[in-house]
Amino acid sequence: MKKIVIIAVLAILLVVISACGNKEKEAQHQFTKQFKDVEQKQKELQHVMDNIHLKEIDHLSKTDTTDKNSKEFKALQEDVKNHLIPKFEAYYKSAKNLPDDTMKVKKLKKEYMTLANEKKDAIYQLKKFIGLCNQSIKYNEDILDYTKQFEKNRYKVESEIKLADNKSEATNLTTKLEHNNKALRDTAKKNLDNSKENEVKGAIKNHIMPMIEKQITDINQTNISDKHVNNARKNAIEMYYSLQNYYNTRIETIKVSEKLSKVDVDKLPKKGIDITHGDKAFEKKLEKLEEK
């Protein structure tokens, strides 16, 4: 009787083991089948990478900004946003949808997702870098615009002063503006020249900006009756607003510059092949599992 029971139990165990083995094999087969879609999505992603001229990043990021460079960087950002990221998201979604029904397949998926996440980090670091470059270009363009605004308002100040009837008020305002400009130049020279970027940020916040605010208040409180001198004052205040914008934007350019300095441009993916690290080893492992 005991023999019959033992034989029956063994038979059941063999059936269970066989069923488990079949389930595992079927799960691996299903994984391999769905992995083909992941591979296809990655090929499409690599094709986009090879066709949007990412390799130009090396050249563009290491040369002085020109109008042509600016347009190329903006075009690159649009290509990344409209073509590269959608293709990557499709690939990543396909990878995340790989089955994980059994322990072995779950382990396999976890191993591949490590590779997929490395690709994700690389792609989004690339996107971030291009975005920072465009930010830097935009801030530099803004600085140029604020400089032009400053000069334009200064010319208006000088023109209105020449038209003034009350020469005393005109002289008083001119003297005040010259004194303010000298004080600002001296402060800038003392605190900004030959200073490190972090020190420049602090100097602008703690010395330059408070001085400009004080000068605006001082000019606003000056008693003026002459129409042209009053117009000169208004333009002088606009001139100082341009200076405020100029220095605020300089702070932003420094922040962007600090972020850019932390990026190793040489390690950014610029061709499709650059995101294939570890793929061959994983594919070989998958092939061996299928052969068993």
What are the residue ranges of the model-derived segments?
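C-terminal motif of bacterial Sec signal peptides marking the signal peptidase cleavage site
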Residues: 15-19
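Post-signal peptide N-terminal segment of secreted/secretory-pathway proteins
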Residues: 60-124
